[in-house]
Design a protein with these regions (language model features):
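Phosphate/NTP-binding elements of NTP-utilizing enzymes
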Residues: 2-264
């Protein structure tokens, strides 16, 4: 790929209408990834590690289960402790969805616009490190949104009715939904729910650490009792390799028992 084919001087991105020749191996891999988002995450998703820099994402068992749940079900609700890789796992699926499906719209919404922007930033880093034959050409690439040559678009914003009014999404990803004030959560769902139910394959993924009695609690409570369509996934802190009784004792010693109960 020569310099004329890169997007706005970024050598990690190809611009729209760039010709790439696929090998037979590329085609096989592309089809395999399209069928299996866990295979895609294990082989093509790069993340930035605090200790090692840019590394290949290797999901834990519970993260693979989450990705499969996102893929196989329309409505997912996930109750997860801090630092269990919930953002990375979610981004892996959203990246798979936008690259390997044409003309899809994804909304990444969080309790704060900066948090949503950070999630999109992680997705963009992973995208830049995909092989060029797997990338779509770039139409637009911004801090709060992107558009790919295959027609797929992603918007990152704070969770509010005004952020999504008049728009339709194939996936709505709601991060830290338990931290969205009740009145905002209520008006948000009143505004967006008709557009979700108008499609037969639209998805809602709700992920949060618990935070009191609120909309997230109600959705979770109803999901556990099969009173709504959400598939509940509860991740325990001990499911992360290396987190055992000693880790718990050390974490409590460095913080407090109360803080551990809140965050884990």
């Amino acid at each position: 790929m020569n310099n004329n084919d890169v997007y706005l001087g970024n050598p990690n991105l190809k611009k729209a209408n760039t010709t790439i020749e696929f090998t037979e191996d590329n085609i096989r891999e592309f089809l395999k990834c399209k069928e299996d988002p866990v295979y895609f995450a294990n082989n093509y998703m790069k993340i930035v590690s605090l200790d090692e820099g840019l590394v290949q994402f290797k999901p834990y068992d519970f993260q693979e289960k989450l990705i499969n749940n996102f893929h196989e079900n329309r409505f997912n609700i996930c109750k997860m402790p801090r630092q269990t890789g919930k953002s990375t796992t979610s981004v892996a699926y959203l990246l798979h969805y936008c690259v390997l499906n044409d003309s899809v719209n994804i909304g990444i919404l969080a309790n704060k616009a900066a948090t949503a922007g950070d999630l999109l930033g992680r997705l963009q880093t992973a995208y830049e490190n995909l092989p060029k034959w797997m990338q779509q050409g770039i139409i637009s690439w911004n801090k709060g949104s992107l558009e790919l040559e295959n027609g797929s678009k992603i918007l990152a914003a704070s969770t509010s009715a005004s952020a999504v009014r008049g728009m339709s999404f194939n996936i709505l990803f709601l991060d830290e939904f338990a931290f969205v004030p009740n009145h905002i959560a209520e008006s948000f769902f009143a505004s967006v729910y008709p557009t979700i139910t108008s499609g037969k394959s639209t998805k809602v993924i709700m992920v949060s650490t618990p935070h009191g009695m609120n909309h997230f609690y109600r959705y979770w409570h109803d999901a556990e009792r099969s009173k709504n369509e959400y598939i509940p996934t509860d991740v325990h802190w001990s499911e992360v390799p290396g987190r055992d009784a000693d880790w718990k004792a050390q974490t409590i010693a460095n913080t407090s028992e109360q803080q551990f109960k809140v965050e884990f």
